[in-house]
């Protein structure tokens, strides 16, 4: 009888898991709001949580702003969480609605398949290393005591972290963003108090490298919640130059008996965790450095080879450290300095100034000879095709880059949707700098600034016209020629047999997030490919067929070009069907952010007191 009762108590239902996660979200958001001073202290009441054996601050709906935040949580976030659509909740405090971030609290959710015998969790090592590991545990081993312990630990760690940060600025904006699992979330789904988020709105912008910390995770068998924090209000800020290596995990338990300082928290021997900067100098009593601080010589050699190849492919004879950081954002500052020292020893570089180098390409015998592209009068048809494709790729790159404020390798590579390698994208950006479309100076986080002038505007209009003509010609050939005609086949091969939505010219016109309404079933996934062409696309693993979607009204310059013309023409065109693996990245943001100013808050409190 006693054993049966213990077994019954140990069972965790899906409803229990959902309620625990919901309560954890409430506790976390309310404590963030209280400790970071987002609302006056009188807006909070003390509340005891028996399940977690701790007291918390509960936010009360004292005015429209506090009520709005509660509605976001109780009616919006919970709706997406209950339906298992929610992938990430971003609780953001920024300078203004579309301005730079101050702090970001990222709550990630996963829904393990508890029908099986195991729950798997993939862990990726932070920094420049690419190692990862998978840990598996039996689902029945997750007990209520383990859940309670993990939840308490995560909340205490979060509270301890926030108390070490600097005070919030007087003027700030509070908002939430939701990211979804695209394979299960309907395209037209929007939770209450949220609206569809544009592509540029889904990306948070930082003016400086934030401090990054992993607070912890809670596995409640049916739901796994993980929390990460970013903040620019680090009192120990050293500009966070090691942004890639500064990801600190606050929930790692150590078997070693490490010494604790006054700034560290030691709640118990079973639940010890450390709040300390990972500056690479912390050692245990045994004098050994942690595994994350070790270096991988093979990986360093790979990174050095990539940087060396990129330097040799450039036409300029000078090099700035900032150029390397912009073109290789995944490499930390320390690693870049090590690579520069290696290239100095190899003779490829010569030091000009403190952070400037001159390039000696001939002095490096290990670097393979890279031919520069030269436009020649007499070229063979094959070379002419290559040059034509290169010009077309450059036009596509300009088409996506010119409307931007800042362009980076990662951003442009994503816009081109895999049509060009990252090395090719770097060369395209260098060409834009030489042609005067992009400034040579760079911001490490944002990239290189795009020059907006009459010349660039005219160039953008030129490119639009050229691409429209190319699309019209491609569509005329696709609709008039038979699938088996050699002329059609030759034409498509010259255009690399693109799928129908790209029209052999422009891959992914506009933002993926603006194409969120599918056509009716008879017209869904219409493609201009047929027979042999469709099978050719399917065999190419690097390119996913793109279905044609009904585009809603578009305001941005990047996503609003060519959409309606292509779509109207495709509506009447015949062709075979191909599958679509939901390539869009759906996201939501709040309909009305909370704009906070201290003066307005004081006036509201005075009115309520009266």
Swiss-Prot record:
- Short name of one Pfam family: HORMA
> What sections of the sequence does the record tag as coiled-coil?
none
**Source organism's superkingdom?**
Eukaryota
Instruction: Spell out the Acidic residues composition-biased ranges.
Output: 243-262
Using the UniProt annotation, give all residue ranges assigned to the region (Disordered): 236-297, 477-507, 520-551
Q: Where is the composition biased (Polar residues)?
A: 522-535
Query: Could you provide one GO biological process annotation from this protein's UniProt record?
Result: microsporogenesis
Locate the HORMA domain: which residues?
A: 15-229
Alphabetically sorted, this entry's keywords are:
Centromere, Chromosome, Meiosis, Nucleus
GO cellular component terms, alphabetically, are:
chromosome, centromeric region; nuclear chromosome; nucleus
Please report the name of this protein according to its UniProt entry: Meiosis-specific protein PAIR2
């Amino acid at each position: 009888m006693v054993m049966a009762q213990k077994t019954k108590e140990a069972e965790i239902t899906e409803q229990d898991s959902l309620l625990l996660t919901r309560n954890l979200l409430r506790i976390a958001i309310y404590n963030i709001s209280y400790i970071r001073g987002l609302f006056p202290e009188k807006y909070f009441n003390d509340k005891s949580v028996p399940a977690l054996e701790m007291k918390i601050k509960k936010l009360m709906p004292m005015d429209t702003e506090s009520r709005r935040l509660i509605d976001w949580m109780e009616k919006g976030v919970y709706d997406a969480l209950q339906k298992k659509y929610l992938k990430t909740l971003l609780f953001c405090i920024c300078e203004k609605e579309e301005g730079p971030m101050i702090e970001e609290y990222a709550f990630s959710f996963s829904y393990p398949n508890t029908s099986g015998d195991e729950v798997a969790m993939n862990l990726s090592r932070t920094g420049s290393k690419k190692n990862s590991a998978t840990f598996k545990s039996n689902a029945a081993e997750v007990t209520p005591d383990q859940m309670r312990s993990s939840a308490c630990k995560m909340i205490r760690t979060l509270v301890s972290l926030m108390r070490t940060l600097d005070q919030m600025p007087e003027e700030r904006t509070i908002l939430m963003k939701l990211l979804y699992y695209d394979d299960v979330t309907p395209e037209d789904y929007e939770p209450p108090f949220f609206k569809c988020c544009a592509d540029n709105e889904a990306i948070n912008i930082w003016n400086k490298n934030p401090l990054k910390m992993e607070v912890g995770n809670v596995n409640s068998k049916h739901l796994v919640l993980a929390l990460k924090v970013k903040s620019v209000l680090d009192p120990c800020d050293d500009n966070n130059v090691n942004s890639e290596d500064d990801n600190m995990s606050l929930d790692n338990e150590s078997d070693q008996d490490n010494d604790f300082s006054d700034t560290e928290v030691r709640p118990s021997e079973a639940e010890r965790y450390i709040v300390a900067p990972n500056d690479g100098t912390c050692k245990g009593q045994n004098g050994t450095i942690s595994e994350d601080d070790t270096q991988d010589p093979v990986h360093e050699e790979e990174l050095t080879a990539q940087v060396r190849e990129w330097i040799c492919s450039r036409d300029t004879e000078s090099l700035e450290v900032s150029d390397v950081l912009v073109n290789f954002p995944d490499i930390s500052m320390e690693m870049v300095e090590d690579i520069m020292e290696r290239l100095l020893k190899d003779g490829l570089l010569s030091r000009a100034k403190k952070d400037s180098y001159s390039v000696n390409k001939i002095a490096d015998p290990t670097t393979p000879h890279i031919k520069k592209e030269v436009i020649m009068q007499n070229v063979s048809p094959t070379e002419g095709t290559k040059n034509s494709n290169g010009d077309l790729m450059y036009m596509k790159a300009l088409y996506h880059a010119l409307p931007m404020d800042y362009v980076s390798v990662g951003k442009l590579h994503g816009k081109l949707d895999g049509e060009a390698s990252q090395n090719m994208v770097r060369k395209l950006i260098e060409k834009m700098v030489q042609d005067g479309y992009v400034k040579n100076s760079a911001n490490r986080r944002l990239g290189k600034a795009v020059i907006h002038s009459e010349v660039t505007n005219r160039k953008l209009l030129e490119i639009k016209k050229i691409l429209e003509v190319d699309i019209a010609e491609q569509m005329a050939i696709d609709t008039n020629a038979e699938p088996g005609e050699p002329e059609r086949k030759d034409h498509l091969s010259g255009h690399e047999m693109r799928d129908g939505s790209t029209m052999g010219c422009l891959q992914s016109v506009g933002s993926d997030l603006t194409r969120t309404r599918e056509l009716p079933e008879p017209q869904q996934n219409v493609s201009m490919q047929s027979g042999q062409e469709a099978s050719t696309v399917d065999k190419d693993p690097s390119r996913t067929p793109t279905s044609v979607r009904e585009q809603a009204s578009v305001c941005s310059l990047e996503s609003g070009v060519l959409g309606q013309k292509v779509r109207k023409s495709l509506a009447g065109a015949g062709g075979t069907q191909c599958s679509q693996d939901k390539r869009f990245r759906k996201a939501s943001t709040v309909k009305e952010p909370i704009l906070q100013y201290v003066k307005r808050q004081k006036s509201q409190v005075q009115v309520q007191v009266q």
